[in-house]
Amino acid sequence: MVEYTEAPELKERAIKIAGKLNLAHIDFDRVHFYRYTCDTRTCAKITGFFKTLQLAYPHINPFYVITFNDKNFSRVSEQEQNQTILHELLHIPKTFSGEFSKIAHSKIYKKSREFI
C-alpha cells in the first residue's frame, strides 16, 4: 500500500514560485502537498475536487492535492523540481473551481523562463 506524507517544504517552494510568477489566484490554504513512493514513472500529479464531487458534498470548498513521487522527484535537479511544481500549479484555473486547466507546453516553458 502506498503511504503518503505531508510535504510542507514543497508547499513553501510552491508559494515562492507562485509569488514570483503572479499566480495570485491560487489559494494555498486549499492546496495540499504530499510525498509518496511508488514504482511508476510519474514524478508528480495534481488531483482536484471535481464538480461532481462538489455536488455530492456541497459544504466542502474546492481544493487541490499535489502529490510527488519521491523516488523520481528527488532524483532530478532543483531547477527541474521547480519546473515540475510550476507545471502542476499551472493546471489550477483562475476560477479555482476544483477542475483543471489544460496547459500548453509553450506556456510552461515561458513561465519557467520567467522564474529562472
Indicate where each model-derived feature is located:
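Functionally constrained cores in energy, signaling, and assembly domains
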Residues: R35, D70, T84
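Active-site recognition of the HExxH zinc-binding catalytic motif
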Residues: Q83-T95
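Short coil/turn segments at beta-strand junctions that form active-site/ligand-binding loops
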Residues: D29, E80-Q81
